[in-house]
């Protein structure tokens, strides 16, 4: 399935939340779902609910692709432990997600650009693959020149240290952060802009693999 390239505000209105963390909340101007019949809420089937939860998760992590969901599920489904937690961890510990959570970027899309354009270092080495899986103990920092980027300095200035997830550490002065421990399911859920039923998504994906 191709990556969504349409208006991001339309996605925010669909789910009724400023899902991408934009400074100007799109719901203030148009609070209703998009479309001619946006106000009419039809009762969804179980399949429809599964699709909606899947789309919510994709949006929360910057419109990730269907094949990335399937791949993540295949990697965890046969492992011991909480499948839902391990599945969600695959996205929360992506490099672009960690860059966003640390406050180096105001939105997940800005974080994706920082990574793709080669501004981000992992353990001192450049990594430009935004899906790179960050493991506990890895340090995330920025290139020296990148520390002066306006999108970085403005974002960090507005970053409230108290909002930093417990599984991360941040040294604002050094533009450096670290994934201290693997995040728990409830910790990840608290960082998402809207509730997502991960178990329903895993059930849906179980029929696709």
Curated annotation (Swiss-Prot):
Keyword list (alphabetical) reads:
Ribonucleoprotein, Ribosomal protein, RNA-binding, rRNA-binding
Pfam families from the entry? Ribosomal_S4, S4
UniProt xrefs under Gene3D superfamilies: Ribosomal Protein S4 Delta 41, Chain A, domain 1 (1.10.1050.10), RNA-binding S4 domain (3.10.290.10)
- Keyword RNA-binding tagged: yes
Region (Disordered) residue spans: 22-45
Query: Does the entry feature the keyword Repressor, yes or no?
Result: no
Which InterPro entries has this protein been placed in?
A: Ribosomal_uS4 (IPR022801), Ribosomal_uS4_bac-type (IPR005709), Ribosomal_uS4_N (IPR001912), S4_RNA-bd (IPR002942), S4_RNA-bd_sf (IPR036986)
MF terms from GO for this chain are: rRNA binding; structural constituent of ribosome
Record domain S4 RNA-binding: where: 93-154
GO annotations under biological process? ribosomal small subunit biogenesis; translation
Name a single GO cellular component: small ribosomal subunit
The family assignment reads:
Belongs to the universal ribosomal protein uS4 family.
HAMAP family found in the cross-reference section: Ribosomal_uS4_B
**Any idea what job this protein has?**
One of the primary rRNA binding proteins, it binds directly to 16S rRNA where it nucleates assembly of the body of the 30S subunit. With S5 and S12 plays an important role in translational accuracy.
| Quaternary structure, from the entry | Part of the 30S ribosomal subunit. Contacts protein S5. The interaction surface between S4 and S5 is involved in control of translational fidelity.
Q: What is this protein called?
A: Small ribosomal subunit protein uS4
Lineage, broadest ranks:
Bacteria, Pseudomonadati, Chlamydiota, Chlamydiia, Chlamydiales
